[in-house]
A protein has these predicted regions:
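C-terminal and late-domain segments of enzyme folds
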Residues: 1-33, 42-53, 57-62, 139-141, ...
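Hydrophobic anchor at the start of a short beta-strand
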Residues: 34, 66-67, 125, 209
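General beta-strand structural signal in soluble alpha/beta enzymes
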Residues: 10, 67-68, 93-94, 125-128, ...
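Class I SAM-dependent methyltransferase SAM-binding "motif I" and its flanking Rossmann-like core
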Residues: 95, 101-169
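A general structural motif
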Residues: 5, 33-36, 89, 122
Length: 228
């Protein structure tokens, strides 16, 4: 990476609800843009229009417009106009929902390529819950906690969202099954792990972000600079 990439945020869930102000204000400021593009892909089977409406109301309260880009199917993800819209955005936000559907829709698609290009050109990219999970490779498989192939915007780490509320047995499995050099990061709801353009990491929110390497708790400084 050449240092021009944008801020990258892994949000632990409960996006666009009271308590997320600190996270989203920081992202709006980093984007320095009047509009956030919301991809409700992971919520395709859970009334994605409601996710967009929630985002619109939430970001309006922060002085920013939100618009939904209905990339819900594999066909949508290959649409060149939708890809162009993603490429032109300065702030992209992947909603929560089904990480497996999100991965299958975006993997190797025109929209995913455009998102990567936008981020490398300085756009802010945020993902919450499912949206956070798929951005890494490997990623946590929500069906049992094992690790599987993710989209790999960053590597060397995997994200467990809803940390502190997720099934403890599944979380334990994710931590213990991880390779010895892989960081498993637990992010609580309404909190975020944020990668800055210089490759450094910070946590935002009222609850601590937890990092595990080799099955043991470590600090944020254990995350590889840049995460790649």
């Amino acid at each position: 990476m050449d240092g021009r990439c944008g801020v990258l945020a892994f949000v632990g869930g409960a996006e666009w609800t009271d308590g997320c102000q600190a996270v989203d204000r920081a992202l709006v400021a980093a984007a320095d843009a009047a509009e956030v593009t919301v991809l409700p892909t992971a919520a395709a089977f859970e009334h994605p229009e409601k996710a967009v409406a929630t985002a619109e109301a939430w970001f309006a309260g922060l002085g920013c417009r939100a618009r939904g880009l209905m990339v819900l199917t594999r066909g949508d993800a290959q649409d060149e106009q939708l890809a162009a819209d993603v490429r032109a955005s300065r702030f992209l936000y992947l909603s929560g929902g089904s990480p497996m559907h999100l991965r299958s829709v975006l993997k190797g698609s025109a929209v995913w390529t455009a998102l990567v290009e936008a981020w490398l050109a300085g756009a802010v990219v945020a993902g919450s819950s499912a949206g956070a999970m798929v951005l890494t490779d490997p990623m946590v498989d929500p069906r049992g906690g094992a690790l599987t192939v993710g989209l790999g915007l960053v590597t060397g780490m995997a994200v467990v969202p809803h940390f502190g509320h997720e099934n403890a047995e599944k979380v334990h499995r994710s931590i213990t099954l991880a390779a010895a050099d892989l960081a498993v990061v637990g992010v609580p709801e309404r909190c975020a792990l944020v990668r800055q353009p210089d490759g450094t990491w910070q946590a935002i929110g009222d609850e601590p972000v937890r990092v595990f390497v080799g099955g043991e708790p470590v600090g944020l400084d254990a995350l590889a600079r840049g995460g790649r």
